[in-house]
Amino acid sequence: GLSGLDSTNAAAAKGPIVDKKVRNNPEGWQRKACWNPVIYQIPGGDLVIYFKIGNKVADWTGWMVRSKDGGKTWSKREPLKEGFLGPIKNKPILRNGRLIAPTSIEEGGWRLYFEYSDDMGKTWKRTEYVKADEGVKAIQPAIMVLKDGRLAAVARTRSEHIGITYSSDNGETWSKLELIDTPNNNSGLDAVTLKDGRHVLICNDRPIPKGIKNGKGLRTPLSVMVSDDGVNWRHWITLEDSPISQYSYPSIIQTSDGKLHCIYTWRRQRIKHVVLDINKMKD
């Protein structure tokens, strides 16, 4: 039910380095890292990559590049509107003519919010922060479309379980964050709604072990799970399971042929690509 392909290396996985002149820097120039690239094909439009620039998360600014020829050539980088970061880790979705980008901030406490555009990405608005119980911190949401028409977003948390929030107005407002039964060890995840209405989640489905000081568990195993409602998840397949290292920051999409494509960091050395056949998915 799966095939795999290793590609590139850890250095390439970090993305390009952008040189920016910094005032009062005696050397004149300072190298700034690019973070969390998100590539997205706007239906009927450009192929875009959203990313962040900054030496630390608190200094992030949002940027993008675009391609009009399927990725062969790219524009110069463009800054996003001040105060907007774009999708923070996971892909946007297009729903009823609206692009909705899942995002979050870490400065001043982990908080989810969403940015949305009604003109295919030309201009953007943003939501309020998603409310949560005291002590529940969440980042890096992934959006699903439920069968009843609502949107749901699952998110990484520090609370040993995946968080979920809902929208009934196409992404303008979101419900208070709830914790579901599926474990999360403070590691990135992604989700996608399939053409048949089911949802698929890729994540490290283990709780944070007791006694861990930094609040992060081992990012292994890496599992793929399936759900009918976005809340109750069934294990489908384990992609990786080794204590040697970690398998992290996964992304998942469904292509036009129905196949699922998973990409993730393999032991902090390479990027791995795995293709899954949903026809072999057992209910």
Give residue ranges: language-model regions.
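Asp-box/BNR beta-propeller blade signature and adjacent active/binding-site loops
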Residues: 1-283
